[in-house]
Design a protein with these regions (language model features):
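A cross-family structural signal marking well-folded subdomains
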Residues: 256-315
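A non-transmembrane, solvent-exposed segment enriched in polar/low-complexity residues
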Residues: 30-184, 191-195, 199-225, 229
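Bacterial Sec-dependent N-terminal signal peptides
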Residues: 1-36, 482-484, 491-493
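Charged, long alpha-helical assembly modules
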Residues: 195-269
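Structural microenvironment flanking redox-active thiols in thiol-disulfide oxidoreductases
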Residues: 376-416, 432-439
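N-proximal helix/coil linker or "cap" segments that precede and/or mark the start of modular domains
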Residues: 289-345, 350, 356, 386-387, ...
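Short active-site neighborhood of thiol/selenol oxidoreductases, capturing the structured segment around
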Residues: 352-381, 395-397
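Thiol/disulfide oxidoreductase modules built on the thioredoxin-like
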Residues: 195, 418, 428-479
Length: 493
């Protein structure tokens, strides 16, 4: 549970608290020393960890002595952020802030971590400990009001508990704002500012314009509390969720919108190496295998503008090779681009290039008769095609992906009556010619890593959709070829 998390306004969302313990002290010229004492332990290994994205990474480890003391100490300074000490058994941890002062002492009582723990040597963490106590107290009251609200049997009780909840929530937010005002230079103030959400102008929009204005205001002010030159916030539990929410919920899923926002954030972070690295790594991981069709254009953009220019020098050779190979597999098949021509021949050896196919819509199907999934899906694709789309002028360009299976390919075509398809394959001579010219293969051009792989092209062979099931192809065609409803028979009724 995370006490840094913003308190939700809605009564429908459960309030949760994370117990954070702080320890910090007077900084020394070099290195750090973190001491923890607890009579609840007399041996084992404890770990000093820090938050980074969704991970809790181990910074150091040390043995707990018979008196329950453990010391973490090195000559190098810790990078600022939110750290934790994980006790033996890994079932308890103490969270604390690390900034300039890095001599830290914590005397912990696990029977009441918030109220019985003593922190010395760190003004930053003393402030943090007081904040914990306040949040813990208000959190229990908020939970009580929430449960009472759920158990309310009439509107009067519901209204009362909802108001109490709102008042308590305001007290908590006011307390946070006061820390920011009274201790503006503190790390806690910086973190609390980073967490703040934009206040919506019209909390209850009435018109569509109200909703649009709310969205635009929220998006415009989403990053107001974030200083992208402050690397400390990447080592916290709340920064990654804020980034994820922005790109997954706030920004339009259209690739151009994501690209524009990605470039903007990277521009703001370019003078902060760790922040820049964090953002570029996350964006690359998010869009190398995107959830939505077409968003692979974001990954290709990141590769072309950043990775291919040597900017991501922190990546090792294996990582860079994987990113490069994936980018090259996607460059030629982005949604909206013209698909690469396929110079294939039919079963009689007659040349039938893709660009020679005249049709308003062309389904390109890469398949293999020995593929179990193909044996199931290809007949279903054909049934859908005959039932709905053949009469609309749609054509299927079926590409055999394994030349050695030509006899089984012909048998399959005859068995399932696929003669209405344009059935083709690439000759060994053509494959050799392409290889010798060091040109990309059709499997690279179309990112064919499994079969069946389906593409939908328009009359000019631009890619409308790709990597879909036959059902999804059917849905897309339904939208594209949807005929106007004939209302003649309903006239006058």
């Amino acid at each position: 549970m995370n006490i840094f998390a913003p308190i939700p306004q809605s009564m429908k969302i459960l309030f949760t608290i994370t117990i954070f313990l702080a320890a910090f002290s007077i900084s020394i010229a070099q290195g750090y020393k973190v001491t923890l004492q607890s009579s609840d332990y007399n041996g084992g290994i404890a770990y000093l960890t820090y938050y980074y994205g969704k991970n809790i990474n181990v910074e150091d480890s040390a043995a707990v002595n018979s008196k329950g003391a453990v010391v973490f100490q090195k000559n190098e300074k810790l990078l600022p952020g939110v750290y934790s000490i994980v006790f033996p058994g890994k079932n308890k941890l103490f969270d604390f802030l690390v900034d300039k002062e890095q001599i830290i002492t914590i005397k912990a009582d696990t029977s009441d971590l918030i109220n019985k723990t003593i922190v010395t040597g760190s003004k930053e963490n003393i402030l943090f400990q007081e904040y914990q106590k306040f949040v813990g107290s208000k959190g229990r009251q908020l939970q009580k009001e929430l449960e009472a609200f759920k158990a309310s049997k009439n509107k009067s009780d519901s209204f009362m508990h909802e108001k109490n909840y709102s008042d308590l929530n305001k007290e908590l937010n006011d307390y946070r704002d006061n820390i920011i005002k009274q201790h503006p230079e503190s790390m806690l103030a910086s973190l609390l500012t980073s967490m703040k959400e934009p206040q919506i102008l019209n909390s209850k929009p009435v018109t569509r314009d109200d909703s649009i204005n709310n969205y635009q205001y929220y998006k415009k002010h989403y990053w107001d509390g974030i200083t992208f030159l402050d690397d400390r916030i990447i080592r916290t539990p709340f920064f990654l969720p804020k980034v994820e929410k922005f790109f997954r919920e706030v920004v339009s899923p259209a690739p151009d919108s994501i690209i524009r926002e990605s470039d903007y954030l990277l521009l703001r972070a370019r003078a902060a190496p760790e922040m820049y690295k964090f953002l570029l790594n996350w964006l690359t991981d998010e869009y190398i295998n995107p959830k939505y069709m077409g968003q692979d254009a974001v990954f290709v953009h990141l590769f072309e503008k950043y990775h291919s220019k040597g900017i991501s020098s922190w990546l090792n050779e294996k990582q860079m090779t994987a990113i490069s190979n994936r980018a090259y597999m996607l460059m030629s098949n982005l949604i909206g681009d013209q698909a690469a021509n396929l110079e294939m021949v039919d079963s009689a050896g007659v040349s039938v290039p893709l660009y020679g196919v005249i049709a308003d819509y062309t389904i390109v199907c890469f398949w293999d008769p020995t593929c179990g999934h193909c044996r199931e899906e290809v007949p279903r694709l054909d049934s859908m095609y005959h039932a709905k789309w053949e009469k609309e002028g749609v054509k299927i360009y079926g590409v055999l992906t394994e030349n050695k299976e030509q006899s089984k390919w012909r048998e399959f075509i005859n068995k399932y009556n696929l003669q209405s398809w344009i059935n083709v394959y690439q000759t060994e001579e053509k494959k050799k010619e392409i290889d010798e010219a060091k040109k990309p293969s059709y499997k690279q051009l179309y990112d064919v890593t499994q079969t069946p792989t389906l593409y939908l092209l328009d009359k000019d062979k631009h890619i409308i959709a790709k990597k879909l099931t036959w059902q999804q192809i059917d849905d897309v065609l339904e939208m594209k070829i949807k005929k106007p409803v004939n209302n003649i028979n309903n006239a006058g009724k």
